[in-house]
């Protein structure tokens, strides 16, 4: 017999489905834009594609699994653990992609003349592969033993049951809060976020310094070159800010769970924190569309070429290679 779904659960599922319906097409559009526009082929946009792939997976995989967990099916412990781990992998991948983007923007303003020889497509691909491999290691650590199996088994055996425990599948029931706080948050989330803040502060400082000094750059026009870098840096810093705003509340709630087990956490706050984490995957394409000219033009061209019912002359015959507005 299928589990009973309350009105509150139905509302939760509806919101999650809405987020997925925005996130998946939006991030597929980002990947599509990079594919069709040669001007979006530098290292920064390769890292943005990696971020978009993670966000597509959130909408297509993590949100359906979150809905399944919310319904609360009875599963074996390790089955539930496998359901819980993908979000850890994808979150870590997003953080490392954001860190790679920050380092890339720093190099663009720190060594503009040597940037293209230092940051090659091959090195960017190696960095992306390294980020995903590291994300798999961090996200699958609970599968290697850092989980709540011993606690669950103790209760399971106390009831006279044998074999692998069968539980109501819930994230906190299988994932250790020590892992989430000490390892995931304090090692793999908070330090990279703080490092990225410092990197962007240095990027803004270097750009302002160069604009004031008007030092020549590879473009031959320092105002145009560094003005463009400033705008892109602001847009990418906004992506970082939205990520932190979306994920920190849930990690703070995890800290409360670990350090104050008797403290009550209102269910509405938990759901809001979950919606923020999933909703973050839908935010980035919107930021790109409104803040980065190359993406905006490419999105419109894709729309005009593939989705308009009435043929209309394209707004740009050729996609721009460079725009000062970028």
Curated annotation (Swiss-Prot):
Compartment(s) where it occurs, according to its Swiss-Prot or TrEMBL record: Cell membrane
Chaperone is among the record's keywords: no
Tissue: Widely expressed in brain and spinal cord.
Domain of life: Eukaryota
Membrane topology category: Multi-pass membrane protein
Keywords: Cell membrane, Disulfide bond, G-protein coupled receptor, Glycoprotein, Lipoprotein, Membrane, Palmitate, Receptor, Transducer, Transmembrane, Transmembrane helix
Cellular-component GO terms for this entry: asymmetric synapse; axolemma; basolateral plasma membrane; calyx of Held; cell body; cilium; dendrite; dendritic spine
Glycosylation sites: 148, 159
Disulfide bonds: 80-169
A Pfam short name: 7tm_1
A GO biological process held by the record: negative regulation of systemic arterial blood pressure
GO function term, MF aspect, one: protein heterodimerization activity
Record lipid sites (S-palmitoyl cysteine): 309
Segments on the Cytoplasmic face: 34-46, 103-123, 202-235, 293-326
Residue numbers on the Extracellular membrane side: 1-10, 70-80, 147-176, 260-267
Keyword Transmembrane helix: yes
Membrane spanning residue stretches: 11-33, 47-69, 81-102, 124-146, 177-201, 236-259, 268-292
Assigned protein family: Belongs to the G-protein coupled receptor 1 family.
Summary of the function given for this chain in its UniProt record: Receptor for adenosine. The activity of this receptor is mediated by G proteins which inhibit adenylyl cyclase.
Name of the protein this chain belongs to: Adenosine receptor A1
Originating organism: Rattus norvegicus (Rat)
């Amino acid at each position: 017999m299928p589990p009973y779904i309350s009105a509150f659960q139905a509302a939760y599922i509806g919101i999650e489905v809405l987020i997925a319906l925005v996130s998946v097409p939006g991030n597929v559009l980002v990947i599509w834009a990079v594919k069709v526009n040669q001007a979006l082929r530098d290292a920064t946009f390769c890292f943005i594609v990696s971020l978009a792939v993670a966000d597509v997976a959130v909408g297509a995989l993590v949100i359906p699994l979150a809905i399944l967990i919310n319904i609360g099916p009875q599963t074996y412990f390790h089955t539930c653990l496998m359901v819980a781990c993908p979000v850890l992998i994808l979150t870590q991948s997003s953080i490392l992609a954001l860190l790679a983007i920050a380092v890339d923007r720093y190099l663009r303003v720190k060594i503009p003349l040597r940037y293209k020889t230092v940051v090659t497509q091959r090195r960017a691909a190696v960095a992306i592969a390294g980020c995903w491999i590291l994300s798999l290691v961090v996200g699958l650590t609970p599968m290697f033993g850092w989980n709540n199996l011993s606690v669950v088994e103790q209760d399971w055996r106390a009831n006279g049951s044998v074999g692998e425990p069968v539980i109501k599948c819930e994230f906190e029931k299988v994932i250790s809060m020590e892992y989430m706080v000490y390892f995931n948050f304090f090692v793999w989330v908070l330090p990279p976020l703080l490092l990225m803040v410092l990197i962007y502060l240095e990027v803004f400082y270097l750009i302002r310094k160069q604009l004031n000094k008007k030092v020549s750059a590879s473009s031959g026009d320092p105002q145009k070159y560094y003005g463009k870098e400033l705008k892109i840096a602001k847009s990418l810093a906004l992506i970082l800010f939205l990520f932190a705003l979306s994920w920190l509340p849930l990690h703070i709630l995890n800290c409360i769970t670990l350090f104050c087990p008797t403290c009550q956490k209102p269910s509405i706050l938990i759901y809001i924190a979950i919606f923020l984490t999933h909703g973050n995957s839908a935010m980035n394409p919107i930021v790109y569309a409104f803040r980065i000219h190359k993406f905006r033009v490419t999105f419109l061209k894709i729309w005009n070429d593939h989705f308009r019912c009435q043929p209309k002359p394209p707004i740009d015959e050729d996609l721009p290679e460079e725009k000062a507005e970028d």
